[in-house]
Amino acid sequence: MTLSGVAAQTLRDVQVIVADQSQEPVTHSQVVQTLGRVIEARGGSVEWHSREPIHGIAEQRDFLLKRASARAVLYLDDDVLMEPWVVERLLDTLDSEHCGFVGAFPAGLSHLDDVRPEQHIIEYWNGPVSPEAVDPGSPQWERWQLHRAANLYHVSQSIPRDALPRLYKVAWIASCVMYDRLKLLEVGGFSFWPRLPRYHSGEEVLVQNLLMRRWGGCAILPSGTYYSQVPSTVLNEAGTVDGHALDLLAEMIEQYTRMAPTVKTTT
């Protein structure tokens, strides 16, 4: 599903890096092979990496970042489908706003009839995206509620077409996120992965928090992305995680943002 969306993008010159930790390599699928050929025929390239052992999602992201060479890197989960314009809009936004990252959060359309107006609170960027410190537990941290169920989709459907697209503020964003590669490296990337247990979460929450403090971050509305809601692979047998990357936040703020310009604090 994910490669189908990549193969249909208006932006064709893409370097796709697939880091596969499936029990059966995805390249055994004729459909997957065909989609890879379509991407190449349209002017892109595809690298296939079947990887063992499994150290967790932060290590996967670290591996992918080390393989990347473009100025912008898109982390795309393997259960996300993009509309054809998404990558181009993300890149245009990253270029125009000069921020650390831009996201396109996917809607879970199984929640299409689950309308939650109390969670439809959205803060727009009405000017240039700018640095901000969004601390855990602050009122701004509650922005994450917008990314539950199909909330973002419902918000986008309630806005007149001529008022879109818009950029909005986030606490963090997952599943489809484009980063400025050099800025991501300036805050250490995902090199902290050896300090986390195998089953962990929050690796993107951590790096995005650091990036927002120095350069800001945002997300696009409408997002143009949808996810299939398949079971997560980051959870242990009990259905939980053994550690969260945000436990490292305080020391990484000191390490990577202490020499940066003062930012607006939103606590």
Residue ranges and their predicted role:
Residues 73:
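Short aromatic/hydrophobic "clamp" motif used to bind/position activated sugar donors
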Residues 77-81:
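The conserved acidic donor/metal-binding loop of glycosyltransferases
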Residues 1, 159, 165-182, 186-267:
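C-terminal catalytic/acceptor-binding lobe
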Residues 70, 97-99, 215-216:
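Short, high-confidence coil segments that cap the C-terminus of an alpha-helix
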Residues 5-49:
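Acidic donor-binding segment of Leloir-type glycosyltransferases
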Residues 134-154, 158-179:
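A recurrent flexible, glycine/aromatic-enriched loop bordering the glycosyltransferase active site
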Residues 51-68:
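Glycine-rich, basic loop-to-helix element that forms the pyrophosphate-binding segment
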